[in-house]
Amino acid sequence: MFHGLELQKVPVSYTHLTLPTTTYALSKVVAEETARHISELSGIPFVGLRLSNIFRPEDYRRVPEFWDDARLRAWNLWGYVDARDVAQAFRRALEVPTSGSQSLIIAAADTIMDRPSADLMAEVFPDVPLTRELIGRETLLAIGAARDLIGYVPEHSWTDEVAGG
C-alpha cells in the first residue's frame, strides 16, 4: 500500500494519487481541482507542490534507523525531501512563468534507504510493475515534471549528512 492505495506502477507520478483515501488527501485533491477550475476560468496560473516527507539537516541522524526494515518507510516509497530543496521548489514555483494549473511532486533524487531502489521494490512490492529500469537508489517518486516545468533539481541528500551514506 502506498498512502492507502494499491500501487499501479513505479515510479509514481502526480496522476497516480488522485483517489484519496483519507480526509487530508481528499482536501488536497479538492484544493488542486479548485485551483485548476479557477485557472481555467481566470487564466491565473497555479502550481501545486506535492511535498514528500520533509527532513531538516538535523533529522538525518535518524536515517540509519530506517534501514533494517524496508517496510517501515514503504508508506511513501522511501521518499523524502530536504527542507532546503522545498524552499527552492517554492521559490521556483513563484518565479518561473507558467500557465494553467499544474501539480508537481517535490522529492529528493534518491530514497532514504541504503540499498538500491530495485531491491526495495522486489522485497516489499514484488508484483508492482516498473515502467523502466531503476538505477541505484533513485527516487521512486517522479520528479521530472517539476524539473521540466519549474527547473526543480534537488541539491541535498541524506548522504551528505550521514557517515557511510
Positions of PLM-derived features:
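Glycine/small-residue-rich pyrophosphate-binding loop that anchors the diphosphate of NDP-sugar donors
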Residues: 8, 77, 136-138
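Substrate-positioning beta->alpha
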Residues: 26, 47-61, 70-92
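Conserved catalytic-site region of short-chain dehydrogenase/reductase
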Residues: 1-6, 23, 54-58
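Active-site helix of classical SDR
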Residues: 23, 27-30
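Catalytic Tyr-X3-Lys helix of short-chain dehydrogenase/reductase
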Residues: 35-40
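Glycine/proline-rich active-site loop of Rossmann-fold NAD(P)-dependent oxidoreductases
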Residues: 41-45, 56-66, 92-103
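C-terminal substrate-binding subdomain of Rossmann-fold SDR/epimerase-dehydratase oxidoreductases
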Residues: 84-165
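Conserved small/polar residues in nucleotide/adenosyl-binding loops
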Residues: 15-18
